Amino acid sequence: FSASGDQVYALSEFVEGQDYMIAQPTEQLRAAGEMLGRLHQQLHGFQSPIEPAWQPMETEIAAQLKDRLARLQSVVGDSETHPVSKHQIALWLDEVNALIENCQLSIVKNGQLPREWVIHGDYRAQNLKFDGARIRAILDLDTARPAERLFDLGYALVFFPAVYQDVPLTSEQQAIFLHAYESTCPLSETERKLLPSHLKLAFLRGITLWLDLYYFAGMRERTGPWIQSYLRCVNEVVGFGGS
């Protein structure tokens, strides 16, 4: 590590490895699900010698989503040239409030989702290196933080192949990933009931990020196909957790 003013720089070792193979993903999906379970299991209960003032993850996500959706409301329109309508943005705003409340109430009511988990924060194929069907390296750990593990698992189930392919995982591929994860780090009944809400939250986090890049960062050509594909598949993608 090297510090310069208020900036801290980290030099990471180069790791040889292969990218995610979208043509034959089954074994890599299985390996990735198992590795995420191992990561959560190994870091469960970890106590850092430094205690940053972390806000609850759901609080950060709620603020992030409300800010993005408010920005989007000012630029989206109802013509076919826009990927989403103002009405859809309004519906998502209402859904954010309901989803966050559901997560918070379940945590308070059940007391079975300890914050002793440490999550990766952006566990996707783009942040993994493979050696055939094995995981060679997990990258970009700068997003790691204490939080309920469902935030990691839900985001991975929805956005694991993002950037490498325009379309999300199928429900069958999600099942492969989840089964492999639970073979190492099983979910509790409380967590199973909350998984659908976390899938929806994950979808909203990703789709609003892409829409933000689409409208405000000059990335329409890049993000447009992703947005269209995920909107077409939204029911299958976020409905998986309830099956």
Regions found by a protein language model. Name each.
Residues 71, 76-78, 206-243:
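ATP/Mg2+ or Mg2+-diphosphate-binding catalytic cores
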Residues 150-185, 201-218:
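Active-site activation/catalytic loop segments of kinase-like enzymes and analogous catalytic loops
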Residues 187-199:
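All-alpha amphipathic helical-bundle segments outside canonical DNA-binding/catalytic cores
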Residues 101-151:
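Active-site acidic catalytic loop and adjacent metal/ATP-binding pocket
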Residues 86-106:
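Mechanochemical coupling/switch segment within NTP-driven translocation systems
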Residues 1-29:
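Conserved structural core of kinase catalytic domains
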Residues 22-91, 116, 228:
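A cross-family kinase active-site recognition segment
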Residues 18-22, 137-138, 163:
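Short small-residue beta-strand/loop micro-motif enriched in glycine and branched aliphatics
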